[in-house]
Each structure stands twice: as structure tokens, then as C-alpha cells.
């Protein structure tokens, strides 16, 4: 009698099928995790830009510093929203768009594209409106998918 050691073809096919099912489930879960991480990164950028603007404006208002925003903003003169927004864009050049990592994440001026944090200065009202579109999935029309904050220039 012949003694065969090894796996049968059926056993090998079952193992390959199980591995295929696990891989398919893993890819779907991984895509969900990466999308969620990008959305959270865009929201985090929004919060950091708003806090940075407020802190640097306050630094100038206190009069303890001659410059703010990594030296890009002269605190010894009166600055309007446009000047502050432009200085902030330069100071925050290291921020990247989570959805397009080769692009800058913070821009001076309106931009509704996904992942960009846009600073729109309003010199008349003395404010900078900071907005971020963190997703463009229109499957749920009831959600705006945009964060917006206003930073006052005092």
C-alpha cells in the first residue's frame, strides 16, 4: 500500500478560498480606516489653524513681541486680515492636504476642494473665516461636510 503524505487538492482549494475571503474583508476595512484617518486629519488641520491664528494675533496684541507667525508678521504696525492671512499661509506651509499630500494644506483665499483649509480674510469686518471641506461624499445631503470658524482681528 502506498503511503501518501500531503494535502489533497480539495484541502488546498479550501485554504485558498479562506485566504481570499479574509483578504477581501481586510481591503474593505483598510479603505474605511484610511478614509476616516484623512477626514480626521483635515478636521485637525482646521482646529490647529484657528488656534494658531488666534494665538499669533494675541501675541501681537499683547505688545510683547515685535513679530509673529515665524517672523512673517510685523507686530509694530497695524495689520489687516489680508496681511495676517498671507503671513499665516507662509508660516503654515508645512501643512499638507490629507487627500492630496503633494499639495499645500493651508491656503490664503477661498478654496472648496476637499482637504484644503482656506483662510478668507475680510478686512471690512476685521476677521478671517477659516473653512475646511473634509469630505465630498454627497450620499447624505443633510450633512454639510464643511467646518467653518471665524477668527476676529482685534
Where are these regions (language model features)?
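Periplasmic/extracellular, small/polar-rich flexible segments of pilin-like filament-forming proteins
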Residues: 55-154
Amino acid at each position: 500500500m502506498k503511503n501518501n503524505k500531503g494535502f489533497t487538492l480539495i484541502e488546498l482549494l479550501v485554504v485558498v478560498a479562506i485566504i481570499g475571503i479574509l483578504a477581501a474583508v481586510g481591503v474593505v476595512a483598510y479603505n474605511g480606516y484610511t478614509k476616516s484617518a484623512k477626514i480626521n486629519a483635515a478636521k485637525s488641520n482646521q482646529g490647529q489653524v484657528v488656534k494658531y491664528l488666534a494665538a499669533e494675533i494675541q501675541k501681537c496684541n499683547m505688545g510683547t513681541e515685535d513679530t509673529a507667525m515665524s517672523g512673517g508678521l510685523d507686530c509694530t504696525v497695524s495689520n489687516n486680515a489680508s496681511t495676517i492671512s498671507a503671513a499665516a499661509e507662509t508660516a503654515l506651509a508645512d501643512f499638507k492636504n490629507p487627500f492630496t499630500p503633494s499639495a499645500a494644506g493651508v491656503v490664503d483665499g477661498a478654496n472648496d476642494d476637499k482637504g484644503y483649509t482656506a483662510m478668507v480674510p475680510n478686512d471690512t469686518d476685521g476677521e478671517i473665516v477659516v473653512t475646511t471641506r473634509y469630505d465630498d461624499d454627497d450620499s447624505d445631503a443633510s450633512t454639510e461636510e464643511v467646518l467653518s470658524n471665524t477668527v476676529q482681528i482685534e
